[in-house]
Swiss-Prot record:
InterPro entries listed in its UniProt record: NAC_A/B_dom_sf, NAC_arc, Nas_poly-pep-assoc_cplx_dom
Biased composition (Acidic residues): 74-93
Protein name as it appears in the record: Nascent polypeptide-associated complex protein
Domain NAC-A/B residue range list: 7-74
Membership in a protein family: Belongs to the NAC-alpha family.
Region described as Disordered: 53-124
Top-rank taxon, per record: Archaea
Source species of the chain: Natronomonas pharaonis (strain ATCC 35678 / DSM 2160 / CIP 103997 / JCM 8858 / NBRC 14720 / NCIMB 2260 / Gabara)
Gene Ontology BP annotations: protein transport
GO molecular function, one term: RNA binding
Keywords of the record: Protein transport, RNA-binding, Transport
Keyword RNA-binding: yes
PROSITE patterns for this protein: NAC_AB
Lineage: Archaea, Methanobacteriati, Methanobacteriota, Stenosarchaea group, Halobacteria
Function: Contacts the emerging nascent chain on the ribosome.
Length: 124
């Protein structure tokens, strides 16, 4: 597809990516967790790369995940919103930074919505 030969020279590949406006960054991640309705996929010591292509960020995770069951996913979400304080300071900080609001506003919105993405979307 990219022509004959044994592959691209890494320097040439980097030059081509720069010309296309693509930045690649290694992230020193200790752990990556992907939560679904039924399970959590936990990557310990995963290789994570952030690719920024003209403002669109894509994360690539390479590693072997450990699968854990989540249990009652519906009641877990309800308890987070009712009890408050179930969100870590990192969660609150992420919402505050993404939405450009104070941490107290971010915390209140997290408690209302029960979800990071929904909180950011509501505040934007």
């Amino acid at each position: 597809m990219f022509g004959g030969g044994g592959g691209l020279n890494p320097r040439k590949m980097k030059q081509m990516m720069n010309q296309m406006g693509i930045d690649l960054e290694e992230i020193d991640a200790e752990e990556v967790v992907i939560r679904t309705a039924d399970e959590e996929l936990v990557f310990d010591d995963a290789e994570v790369q952030l690719m920024d292509a003209q403002g669109q960020q894509t994360y690539q995770v390479v590693g072997e995940p450990e699968s854990r069951e989540r249990g009652d996913s519906g009641s877990e979400d309800d308890s987070e919103t009712e009890s408050g304080g179930e969100f870590s300071e990192d969660d609150v900080e992420i919402v505050a930074q993404r939405a450009g609001v104070s941490e107290s506003t971010a915390r209140e919105t997290l408690e209302e919505t029960g979800d990071l993405a929904a909180a950011v979307q509501k505040l934007e």
